[in-house]
Amino acid sequence: GDVYKRQDVAECAVVGVADALKGQVPLGFLVLKSGVDRAGDTIVAEVVQSVRNTIGPVAAFRQAVIIQRLPKTRSGKILRGTMKKIADGEEYPFPATIDDPAILDEITIALQSIGYPKSE
């Protein structure tokens, strides 16, 4: 919840993604408030620094990506499992209850921009 303290971030989710060295590392997905015109890279760097300052470097939190919106079910539950599978490059069952299927493509593209899925 600490990520929320940044005034530019409207919503966020953190999922554990596969990592060759550590087994799993946290990856943040940030949805910015509308009208934020600061550079995404700057905001990501601030959020990562803020989390590391709060939780400590043991959190291994180094990466976050900005997305338009979080994938949710129609009842509002964040589809973290699906986000993890996209980041890990795994096949995933299409979530029948997803609110807007187009968002999964947006997430795939956003993840590609920071090098996910990692190729073996």
Where are the regions that the model predicts?
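Short, small-residue-biased leader/transition segments that mark boundaries at the very start
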Residues: G1-Y4
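Conserved C-terminal "lid"/linker of ANL adenylate-forming enzymes
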Residues: A13-A20, Q24-F29, V44, V48-E120
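Short beta-strand-to-loop capping motifs
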Residues: L30-S34
